[in-house]
A protein has these predicted regions:
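A short, flexible loop at the N-terminus of ABC-type nucleotide-binding domains that lies
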Residues: 1-33
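Helix-to-loop junction immediately C-terminal to a conserved catalytic motif
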Residues: 58
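Conserved ABC transporter NBD signature motif
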Residues: 66-75
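Conserved ABC ATPase "signature" region
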Residues: 74, 122-137
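ABC ATPase NBD coupling module
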Residues: 75-92
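Conserved catalytic motifs of ABC-family nucleotide-binding domains
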Residues: 93-108, 116
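ABC-type ATPase nucleotide-binding domains, specifically the catalytic core motifs of the NBD
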Residues: 108-123, 131
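Conserved ABC ATPase signature
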Residues: 141-150
Length: 152
């Protein structure tokens, strides 16, 4: 599977919102395209579907109306193998509960995923730690880091 270049939401709406008379949103019931290499901020009140959107895009849930395409393919048509390949090479998600191993160092936690994908060289990984302002924490066990440091 080649790298994904765009995520296209077409009139997408969580099923839980379907029975509401009106949903005012910059995301739901819109035609949106998120393009590779661009940065986007989705900011909204609690309970408006931010986590749901991430779960749909990551393939964890499909309880929505409308269409979500990766490039030109409807994601509801993806097989388990295709989802695995996407998550290895094109998608990554920072979960709210972090899903890290507190007994491993920050670098070891990052290397776990990177060893599966072979996506970044160690030099590149170390550069990210530097950019995030936590280069001095690479050999610290994650359980000893602040929550903000763990998120980075």
């Amino acid at each position: 599977m080649n790298g994904m270049n765009s995520i296209h939401l077409q009139q997408t709406l969580p099923q839980v919102f379907a029975d509401r008379n009106s949903v005012t949103s910059d995301v739901w019931h819109q035609d949106l395209i998120f393009r590779k290499g661009e940065m986007y901020l989705i900011e909204a009140a609690s309970g408006t579907g931010k986590s749901s959107l991430c779960s749909y895009i990551y393939g964890y849930r499909n309880d929505y109306q409308g269409i979500i395409n990766f490039d030109e393919t409807n994601i509801k048509a993806y097989s388990v193998k295709q989802w695995v390949d996407l998550r290895k090479h094109s998608l990554s998600m920072l979960f709210q509960d972090l899903r890290i191993f507190t007994e491993l160092t920050a670098l070891e936690n990052v290397q776990l995923k990177n060893n599966l994908t072979g996506y970044k060289k160690k030099k590149e990984v170390l550069a990210y730690f530097e950019q995030l302002g936590i280069a001095d924490k690479i050999n610290v066990k994650v359980g000893k880091l602040s929550f903000g440091q763990q998120q980075r």
